[in-house]
Each structure stands twice: as C-alpha cells, then as structure tokens.
Amino acid sequence: MRRLPAVAGSFYESDPKKLKMQIEWSFRHNIGPRDIPKQSYEKKKRDNLFFIVPHAGYIYSGPVAAHSYYYLASEGKPDVVIILGPNHTGLGSYVSAWPKGEWETPLGSVKVDEEVLMQLVMESEVIDLEEKSHLYEHSIEVQLPFLQYFFDDNFKIVPIVIMMQTPEIAEFLADAIYKVIQKYSDKDIVVLASSDMNHYDPHEITMKKDEEAIEKIQQLDYRGLYEVVEGKDVTLCGYGPIMVSLILAKKLGKKAYILKHATSGDTSGPKDSVVGYLAARFGS
C-alpha cells in the first residue's frame, strides 16, 4: 500500500534536486538556523523527544521548520517518527492512522512501522486504521522530505491525523504513545506535532495572538492552550497534536524550549495577512 504525494510541486519542489536545494535554503535562510547539521546515522543519546514543526509551503515555513530539524538531526537518526497532524480536509475518522505500507515523496519512500502502529492502536481507544483521512492531507507529508534529507529511508513513520482536537482525545493519544515509548525502550522514537499558528491576521496581531498560545506551551498547560484557541480566536490549526506533546513532555519530565517564532511576512510575503509558525523542542 503506497501513499502518493499530494502536495509535491505546490508546497515543495517535485524535482528531487530542487527539493534538496529548497531544504538547504530553509536551513541557510536568515530566519532559519543559518547552518545545516551533518548527516549522521550514528546512535546518540537523545534528549529532545518531541518537536513542534510548521507545515506550510516551504517558501513560507521552511526556515522555521529547519530549527526543529536542526536539533532532531543533530542527535542522530531516530528509528521511528510518530507524526501527528491536524485533519484539514474533513475526510475520514476523528483520529486516523495510515495502516501499512509506504509513503512516497520525490526523495523516495518511507515505510510505516506497522508493529509500533498496531501496539499504539491496541493501547488507544480512539485511533482508526484508514486511508481516506490521509489522501489529500498535507500536514504529515511536508515533514517527510526534511527527514529524508538527513536519513534517506533508514527510519520508519507512524502517521496519525487528528480531526477531533479536544483535551480528552489528546489525553487518550498521549497515554497510548507514552505506553508505546516505554514498551519499545530499545527503539529511538521521536514525536512530531505538526501545526501552524494563527492564520490571516496582520503580522503584529498574529505575533500577539501566538504569544498567548506560546505561553501555555512553555507552561506545558494543554488545557490552557485549548482555552486560548477556543476562547480567544487564536486560529492555531494543530492544537490537538501540540496538546499531545505537552502531556507527553510532562509525563517524561521534559521542558519546552522555543526555537523560533515568525510569520509568513518574515519569510516571503506581505505582512497585512500572515500565518504564524513555531519551532519548539521538548528536552531536559
């Protein structure tokens, strides 16, 4: 079973050489880390287990995403990357995992870790196995070329999209992922929370709204984050994945570190209507 790319040629380059150049541009951009970590398959002790990464077109959010991938790649190759993304399309189940096979991008194919996935489904009360939710969804797909740039096909993924973004669903998912991390302690498992921040306000308003959400992220206050999103018109699309990361970080004694906060107005667009982007890591 193959999941074909849905947004190659629009969100990122469809030509492999141009795509690699686009990723390198993201790292070297003045909004990015301005450096590219060395490619390494070496096993290292990983401190940063969870990351927040944006998921817009690379020309907009790539430089911000590069901050998270800089830390991820610097700590060596993970065995499994659990990627949590919001469901933008409204298709499929409330919480959906792609069941098996491979995901393709212009840089090659990445296999789904079916063993870890099935254990996660067993531990969880909310995950359905189905493809419909994933066919046109971009929030997971756009993360893969960054991972492939550093690790080729030498890692596996567990792709999960979340339509029902409530604290209760986040608790179920976080508890299941926590149990899987404990069970597979011999595997190097990383979790990515794919999310953009506030949408389509002017730059200054977006930065201010985002800061309210970022304050809750730094406090690992997942219910506070939910209240900010629901009560203060902060149009953060992947708050479900972020809530899962906050719960996991607290369970495992990790702290939130903000790596970069910017908007599309900072990277490549006008500032009258922007989208906010955040890169963050959760470590000691």
From Swiss-Prot:
It comes from the Archaea. InterPro entries: MEMO1_fam. Transmembrane segments: none annotated. SUPFAM superfamilies: LigB-like. Belongs to the MEMO1 family. NCBIfam families: AmmeMemoSam_B. PANTHER family: PROTEIN MEMO1 (PTHR11060:SF0). This is MEMO1 family protein SSO0066. The lineage of its organism: Archaea, Thermoproteota, Thermoprotei, Sulfolobales, Sulfolobaceae.
